């Protein structure tokens, strides 16, 4: 992903790196609900990760909570965003403009992760050439051409399961360095490629 997440990969276990964005999105949601402090137990109830594991994961980002109170929510958000590199926006392409892909284009919530979708790809002639929320939809065959003219290294995967690996391979061959996978299929990627396996509940 050419962002800090990749930079810290030598120091932080990969499973931890994959979980940190979940924590960030849930903490932001709690802030919107009026919370000023959040505990690892509260986060655990939202994402089904053991509270002790969450506390261990957060120890890597140099923030400590208060006994029986938890973490100051604004400070935790700031630390996680800075650690993950989400303080700046990163451009992304979306692959698969079905119901899920369309929903993400209309109101993705991905900006919480520092992602800005600047283009989408599909093969449906009824979609190609149109825009959703100001985001253009291109034919999948145009991907490599668009990669040459856009500063994009992140791909958001929302295609049907049966072509998830095929499209992932095409994305990586075209220069994508990180994949945000919203399909149930666990894609296989080279070691130097970052993958986030997500669903709408995470955003």
Where would I find each of the regions flagged by the language model?
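Rossmann-like NAD(P)-binding element
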Residues: 145-169
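Glycine-rich, highly charged phosphate/nucleotide-binding loops
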Residues: 135-144
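ADP-ribose/adenylate-binding Rossmann-like module
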Residues: 170-193
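Glycine-rich Rossmann-fold phosphate-binding loop(s) that bind the pyrophosphate
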Residues: 97
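NAD(P)-binding Rossmann-fold cofactor-contacting core
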Residues: 113-133
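HTH-adjacent hinge/linker in prokaryotic transcriptional regulators
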Residues: 37, 41, 46-89
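Extreme N-terminal segment that seeds HTH/winged-HTH DNA-binding domains in transcriptional regulators
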Residues: 1-36
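Conserved small/polar residues in nucleotide/adenosyl-binding loops
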Residues: 201-203
């Amino acid at each position: 992903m050419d962002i800090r997440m990749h930079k810290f990969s030598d120091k932080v276990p990969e499973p931890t790196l994959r979980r940190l964005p979940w924590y960030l999105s849930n903490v932001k949601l709690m802030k919107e609900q009026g919370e000023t402090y959040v505990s690892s137990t509260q986060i655990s109830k939202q994402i089904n990760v053991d509270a002790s594991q969450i506390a261990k994961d957060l120890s890597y980002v140099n923030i400590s909570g208060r006994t029986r109170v938890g973490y100051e929510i604004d400070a935790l958000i700031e630390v996680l965003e800075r650690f993950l590199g989400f303080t700046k926006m990163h451009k992304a392409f979306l692959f698969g403009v079905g119901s899920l892909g369309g929903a993400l284009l209309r109101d993705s919530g991905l900006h919480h992760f520092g992602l800005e979708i600047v283009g989408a790809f599909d093969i449906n002639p009824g979609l190609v050439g149109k825009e959703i929320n100001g985001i253009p939809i291109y034919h999948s065959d145009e991907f490599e051409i668009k990669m040459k003219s856009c500063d994009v290294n992140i791909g958001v995967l929302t295609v049907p399961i049966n072509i998830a690996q095929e499209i992932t391979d095409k994305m990586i061959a075209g220069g994508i360095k990180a994949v945000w996978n919203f399909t149930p299929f666990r894609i296989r990627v080279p070691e130097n490629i970052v993958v986030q396996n997500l669903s709408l509940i995470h955003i």
